[in-house]
Amino acid sequence: MDKNELVQKAKLAEQAERYDDMASCMKSVTEQGAELSNEERNLLSVAYKNVVGARRSSWRVVSSIEQKTEGAEKKQQMAREYREKIETELRDICNDVLSLLEKFLIPNASQAESKVFYLKMKGDYYRYLAEVAAGDDKKGIVEQSQQAYQEAFEISKKEMQPTHPIRLGLALNFSVFYYEILNSPEKACSLAKTAFDEAIAELDTLSEESYKDSTLIMQLLRDNLTLWTSDTQGDEAEAGEGGEN
């Protein structure tokens, strides 16, 4: 199938909310080796975000059931086996995306904006792996995630306006990484607050087409800050995450 047909099919799949099909089309487009257009990049990102999102959400539900069935051995074993099945799916999806990023997307990114977008994506998918990792594996995965976010963060500060939705989305997800994965609420808050304040200070640089995206992410940054500063008791707080714009 040629590229245009695959992209067309991906859009159809998106409208039908068949995200596995959508991801499979956009994976094929990526494997053709050319740099993706902004539209193709967003289709790829939306597809995989939904595919992995469904598994992350299932994993949380089943993990919580597994913890609640302590003492009921049969039930707990069933929940554990089901969680492990979901984990395998989740890992396969993340490894698919990370392989596309390493082989095609990051090496082919010619603009700073694309580079930041893909490095952020690399940070995100290592973070999703870190959520389900345990033991020795986890440390290496967490480091990979942090490195990708950090590299993206440095490029974004040099090359992009503080109001750019990709720079804001990166700050949002990197701060979630500090809060949820590294358990560093102070660092998470300081990163989110700085990103929010810098964007507020330069609101006049907001372009017409990204106005909605940028202000939405700023709202999410502020929501997380409110949640995290009130959450000093260390309750499990579900942080909002960046839309892939």
From Swiss-Prot:
Tell me the name of the encoding gene.
Answer: YWHAZ
This one is known as 14-3-3 protein zeta
Q: Sorted alphabetically, which keywords does the UniProt record give? A: Cytoplasm, Phosphoprotein
Matching InterPro entries: 14-3-3, 14-3-3_CS, 14-3-3_dom_sf, 14-3-3_domain
Describe, as the record does, how this protein assembles with itself and its partners.
Answer: Homodimer.
Annotated site residues (Interaction with phosphoserine on interacting protein) in this chain: 56, 127
Supply the SMART domains for this chain: 14_3_3 (SM00101)
Which Pfam families is this protein grouped with? 14-3-3
**Can you provide one Gene Ontology molecular function annotated for this UniProt record?**
phosphoserine residue binding
Assigned GO CC terms: cytoplasm; cytosol; extracellular space; glutamatergic synapse; hippocampal mossy fiber to CA3 synapse; nucleus
Its primary localisation, in coarse terms, equals: cytoplasm
- Family in the record: Belongs to the 14-3-3 family.
- Function (record text): Adapter protein implicated in the regulation of a large spectrum of both general and specialized signaling pathways. Binds to a large number of partners, usually by recognition of a phosphoserine or phosphothreonine motif. Binding generally results in the modulation of the activity of the binding partner.
UniProt subcellular location: Cytoplasm
